[in-house]
């Protein structure tokens, strides 16, 4: 079927092992596994705290594959850099809710919500990430309902609300 994709656990395990050999200075390694036009599937491995980030125009859908860690969600992101497409990274994430993560956990992070992935001390955290374009109701962006945000840098999305 056009657009169909099946990623088996054995294949993810192979990618996980390869990523572990390619850890960069930012304590992470990543690989785009599949591209589907306006969204993609990535595998990320972290062996140290990830930089805080927020995405104005994308939802992060995450499935923890291996390891242990914590997701910090929400709070205030300060001192970050905003790049193309509303991608904000770096700086300091103050406050936010903490969620323990383990293999099999499934996470939906709405657009514009600051977050950071923190592996457990001395451990790693590997997760499958689906970056999906955010679609806003007409009341949240100019134009017609169902329109994808285009670099507006803001939504009315709040932590704990969908």
Task: List each language-model region with its residue ranges.
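Conserved metal-binding segment of the jelly-roll/cupin
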Residues: 100-121
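Short, conserved beta-strand element in jelly-roll/cupin
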Residues: 56-76, 85-92
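A short, N-terminal "cap"/entry segment at the start of jelly-roll beta-barrel domains
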Residues: 1-56, 142-153, 159-162
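His/acidic/aromatic-lined binding-pocket segments of jelly-roll/cupin-type domains
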Residues: 53, 60-63, 98-99, 106-107
């Amino acid at each position: 079927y056009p657009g169909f994709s099946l990623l088996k656990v054995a294949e993810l395990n192979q990618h996980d092992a390869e990523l572990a050999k390619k850890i960069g200075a930012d304590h992470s390694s990543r690989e785009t596994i599949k591209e589907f036009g306006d969204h993609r599937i990535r595998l990320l491995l972290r062996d140290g705290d990830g930089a805080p980030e927020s995405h104005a125009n994308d939802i992060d859908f995450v499935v923890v594959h291996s390891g242990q860690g914590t997701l910090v969600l929400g709070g205030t992101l300060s001192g970050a850099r905003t790049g193309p497409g509303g991608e904000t990274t770096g700086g300091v994430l103050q406050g936010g809710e903490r969620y323990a993560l383990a293999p099999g956990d499934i996470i939906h992070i709405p657009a514009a919500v600051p977050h950071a992935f923190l592996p457990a001390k001395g451990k790693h955290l590997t997760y499958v990430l689906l970056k999906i374009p955010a679609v806003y109701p007409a009341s949240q962006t100019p134009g017609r309902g169902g329109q994808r945000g285009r670099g507006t840098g803001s939504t009315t999305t709040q932590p704990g609300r969908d």
